[in-house]
Amino acid sequence: METTLAKQLSGELNDILGRLDNSVRLVMDRCPEAEFNAYRTAIGRVMGVLVLDVLNPLYARNPEAKPDGYDDE
């Protein structure tokens, strides 16, 4: 994969992770605790898949696409 595409994908996927994280905060502020816990668990799974199955392999093959401060350990 070319570096430009890897960097673009990295940016898009990190934006998605940020939006998912923000959605958890919205639910935390507006929903009952049980509903929040279920939502947070589900979103955590989605975020885990994006990081472990998509971003980490992307960065392993294209280290130049890894954002500054990204810790994959």
Each model region followed by its residue ranges:
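N-terminal acidic leader/helix
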Residues: M1-E33
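An interfacial alpha-helical scaffold signature
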Residues: L26, D72-E73
